[in-house]
Regions:
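Second-shell loop/turn segments in exported
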Residues: 12-22, 47-48, 90-95, 147-148
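Metal-dependent phosphoester-hydrolase catalytic domains
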Residues: 37-43, 53-168
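Active-site metal-binding loops of divalent metal-dependent hydrolases
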Residues: 8, 50-51
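His/acidic metal-ligating clusters that form di-metal
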Residues: 25-48
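A shared catalytic/ligand-binding motif for oxyanion handling
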Residues: 6, 20-23, 42
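Beta-strand-turn-beta hairpins that frame and shape the catalytic cleft
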Residues: 1-12, 165-168
Length: 168
């Protein structure tokens, strides 16, 4: 199992002006994944983190080549389960009342087999418990951030995946 932990460049300065930096991060991730797969065709790889782009941005769809439908993913390709969550209106971060999914966990197609004698991907989610949500004011419903005047957690909701296998 190989884990790539990421924090891609910020959108500070404007989404379009900074897009090339995140696209470069996506290309580097793809290059690392390709290298690992050359060493082991059946490598199980997970790339995850705060990517500062959503599942439909060029850094994810083109540079990394992630696909949102399990059935369209070959073993050497990358599956992004968070694309489906965004299409359902869910998100990890909100800006001007628009949700996006900047925090993602993506897996190579080697995690998508129906052979549960080895670890396989089952499902993904966004962790949104009440204690993580702003309950009042301008940002009601947003992640409860930490500030000088309030105790909170983060401006992003956490994400998770379930990896399962058959018991012995």
């Amino acid at each position: 199992i190989h884990l790539l932990i990421n924090h891609w460049p910020s959108r500070s300065g404007g989404e379009q002006k900074t897009s090339a930096y995140r696209e470069a991060a996506g290309k580097l991730n793809k290059k690392i994944i390709d290298s690992l797969q050359q060493l082991s065709v059946n490598a199980k790889i997970i790339t995850m983190g705060d990517l500062n782009d959503g599942p439909h941005n060029k850094s994810i769809k083109v540079a990394l080549g992630a696909k949102g439908k399990k059935t369209a993913v070959a073993p050497h390709e990358i599956f992004n389960p968070f694309e489906a969550l965004l299409s359902k209106g869910l998100g990890t971060i909100a800006h001007q009342d628009a949700w996006d999914v900047f925090d993602q966990i993506m897996l190579t197609g080697t995690w998508l087999s129906s052979d549960y004698s080895t670890w396989q991907y089952w499902k993904a989610g966004i962790f949104q418990r009440n204690y993580l949500i702003q309950t009042q004011g301008k940002y009601k419903g947003y992640p409860l951030r930490h500030s000088l005047t309030e105790v909170g957690y983060s401006d992003h909701f956490p994400v998770y995946v379930y990896l399962i296998r058959e018991g012995k």
